[in-house]
């Protein structure tokens, strides 16, 4: 009997994940996990390599961890959950991953297929209640592929396909269901035992399309680059910095989910596109589903729009207008390299134009810096604490390469961000709860770097804080959690005011459905999990409390600051 035939499919499944470079399985187990648990228990006596398995007591945290882990490491993680109910708990975070093009393998058990006749047949009443006609339907709109492992199939082949699809551009999550009987059955040997890079090679942009884009940008008096996440790959961040500097093209990181251009770069013109969009006669958009809000940010008449990305039409979005003059499909890092080369020819002899633009943009940047500095000075003594002052204090104390995971906690325009993969913004899906688990995943990917999870109080509720603090302690992943606590659902309040600026709700002393008082002592939640916790209510308390928090984290103790902040707007 061969080794492949002697071992269970569950063992083959775990081995193949490790063979393909998966380092972590983030798991929330149920009765469907019996073969997986048996496989893990057998492993110490074998020479088979498995990914490290981490227990995460809530599915939302587990998927958010995988999300944050990929954003910092560039590697996919696997999340395993309990049948239909675990999948349902994971779907919110799965939506976030899908809209953020994050490859995650979400694996779920399937209630046993058989009532009798197999050691893994149904033996609990829930095994009838948890079955669905179409379990994959829970996820189908937000995954690239879903499949159920079947009897007689090599687990290796299914793992390979899952990883390849997830890691092919545009990247995204996949869903795999794993029946208990199939996992317990003897493994089927793979047809081919090859290991190669994950995913299909990314498409290279059309040379002719890039040449046309260069012609449009070189003819413009005031070209502009907008991006949300092109800097997710550090090499693309380097290319963008070189292109923007060489041709004096300003960059606005609208709806930033990653830091794509260092905030100290001379062509970094902030994160709000409003003013520059009104002036730009050519706009190049890289990796941005919503580069501006059409009803709020009018474009200059006759402005030319060029959109770059692996899917510049964002075909997974049901409706998205954003009409463009040119759509360039391909990997954006490659597009930047090609565009820089094309512009070097198109802009030859245009030194005066470039340098004139550079001077004007230098003045605009200095004005932007002065405005931020003046605003910090104006608000630094205000009580409750202004979020911009909180960001300013954080800048003064954090490590240069610290990773900030920001979910409605801090104004990104107030942060100093100069290192690749140092900023993780929220997904456009808007599923609250990403910030906490995302911070753990970032720390798992880069244990040597400081990780700061900045969340609103509403986001903290949704982040399943007990599960978060448990994993932080159990896995020795000390993060600094900052809660910007305005005691309200601020986004809900602001949305109501935007739609009904003169309405009854806007004029009311207390708007329905937004108040979160009486607020808990969130810092005590961290203390209950052996962390450091402190409440901050005045500006004078902030810097000393931040220092104590950083001291705790740097010594290996998770820390949480509960900061009472202003209701903005």
Can you name each region flagged by the protein language model?
Residues 286, 308-310, 406, 456-457, ...:
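Active-site flanking residues adjacent to catalytic metal/cofactor-binding acidic residues
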Residues 1-4, 150-153, 302-405, 508-511, ...:
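Phosphate/pyrophosphate-binding active-site segments
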Residues 177-182, 409-411, 564-566:
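A glycine-rich phosphate-binding loop feature that marks nucleotide/adenosyl-phosphate handling sites
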Residues 171, 218, 300, 399, ...:
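Short conserved AdoMet
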Residues 44, 70, 166, 244, ...:
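N-terminal cationic-hydrophobic initiation segments that often serve targeting/anchoring roles
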Residues 2-349, 469, 478-481, 502, ...:
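N-terminal alpha/beta PP-like core and its mobile active-site loop of ThDP/TPP-dependent enzymes
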Residues 116-129, 277-279, 320-321, 328-329, ...:
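Thiamine diphosphate
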Residues 10-20, 31-40, 362-448:
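Active-site diphosphate/adenylate-binding microenvironment
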